[in-house]
Amino acid sequence: MSFEISVEEIDELIETGNLNIDYALKELGATSQPPPNRPLSQISKTEENNDETRTSKNSASAEAPAHASSPLRSHNEESEPGKQSSDGFSMISNRPQTGMLLMGSDTQSPSPSKTYQGLILDAKKRALNEPRRNQKTTNEHGNTNDTWIFKRGEYSHQERGLGYTESEIKNTIFIPRHRREHSISWVNGRTTISEWCNPCCAPVKSIASVEKCTCGRCPKICELCIRDP
């Protein structure tokens, strides 16, 4: 068995390969056919045109940075104070301009000379000095309830409108009352909560204990312990 290939078979294989290449290039929108033979004068003119094209492209690329730097210069000129563009509008300016869609509302910002602590003190003063207002709230049943806003230093009976005058409040004698205390313990696997009253003059201890009055003015029973066993 001979594996020798004749010249005709080689030519046939080459032609088949060329046809396949031509078909593929045709599908891709190209062609493998060599350009037709042109005279030497036309070839030289084409080469000169190609050289001129390369030269013009190189000069354009060299001039591109100069053109690109011109917007930067105009941008810097607009950012300088007191300078605007020819149409009177600019995106960067030291003063607000009419027609700027990016401008927000004209809000008063805090003075830069004030520190953070100074702003906190101002806020506390406003909160303490502003008048308190009664608020009305509606519960789920549709009933309106009056609620009172707490203000530091005000008496609860004055805030609730019980009719006491300022002089009566100042001359009121403090009456000692009871202090409600609680104890939480774990007994026989169950949590036990105990509560009782101690007189206000008795010291507060970490251990649950029932104390006696030491000033002689505390009541024996108050509204908190009247139902205690």
From Swiss-Prot:
Zn(2+) 2 binds at residues 201, 213, 215, 218. Residues 28-115 are annotated as: Disordered. Zn(2+) 1 binds at residues 178, 197, 222, 225. Residues 82-97, 105-115 have a biased composition (Polar residues). Keywords: Host-virus interaction, Inhibition of host innate immune response by virus, Inhibition of host interferon signaling pathway by virus, Inhibition of host MDA5 by virus, Inhibition of host RLR pathway by virus, Inhibition of host STAT1 by virus, Interferon antiviral system evasion, Metal-binding, Viral immunoevasion, Zinc. The keyword Zinc applies. One of its GO terms (molecular function) is metal ion binding. The keyword Zinc applies. Residues 59-71 have a biased composition (Low complexity). Residues 45-55 have a biased composition (Basic and acidic residues). GO terms for biological process: symbiont-mediated suppression of host cytoplasmic pattern recognition receptor signaling pathway via inhibition of MDA-5 activity; symbiont-mediated suppression of host JAK-STAT cascade via inhibition of STAT1 activity; symbiont-mediated suppression of host type I interferon-mediated signaling pathway. Blocks host interferon signaling. Belongs to the paramyxoviruses V protein family. This is Non-structural protein V.
